[in-house]
Amino acid sequence: MSKNVGKLVKIWNESEVLVDRKSKFQARCCPLQNQKDIPSILQELTQNNKSVSKASHMHMYAWRTAEVSNNLHLQQEQKKKGNKANKSNNSHVNKSRNITVQPKNIEQGCADCGEAGAGQRLLTLLERANIFNVLVIVTRWYGGTPLGSSRFRHISTCAVETLKKGGFLP
């Protein structure tokens, strides 16, 4: 679900609320061009969403920014076959397009909001997926029962869902 919100973030891409033993998790993501906007974005989120302001862990987040340029490479692969008929025509040339992303000036960071290790897990997710210019935030409403390590699985699951909804992941 996408929600219109405010001045800095026009649309939040939100995951569904995941519930486990009365704890609730929800992730949101938005495009990010400048890390200096993060405090204002977080403030805007809590002001415009009263349920977030009541969460036990409002802002577990990670972000990455970079100057990204897409380069289109045309690769030619030759299929070598033993018969002369294939060598006489161009059927052995397979042209495929590969888009490579070449980031420059990468900046990144994360915050746990009291959920030790959560921000780093989110940042690792962004790094492994090679995602740039995004802010991903996970909110947790503690339900009274410790979840152990499964809380990290829930945080990652919600983050992946919102990144897919936002078009940052296929």
UniProtKB/Swiss-Prot annotation:
Record PROSITE patterns: UPF0029
Family: Belongs to the IMPACT family.
Regions that span the bilayer: none
GO biological process: GCN2-mediated signaling; regulation of translational initiation
PANTHER family, sorted: IMPACT FAMILY MEMBER YDL177C (PTHR16301:SF17), IMPACT-RELATED (PTHR16301)
Further details from the record: Present with 907 molecules/cell in log phase SD medium.
GO CC, alphabetical: cytoplasm
Species: Saccharomyces cerevisiae (strain ATCC 204508 / S288c)
InterPro entries in the cross-refs: Impact, Impact_N, Impact_N_sf, Ribosomal_Su5_D2-typ_SF, UPF0029_Impact_CS
Name of the molecule in the record: IMPACT family member YDL177C
Positions of region (Disordered): 79-98
Taxonomy, superkingdom: Eukaryota
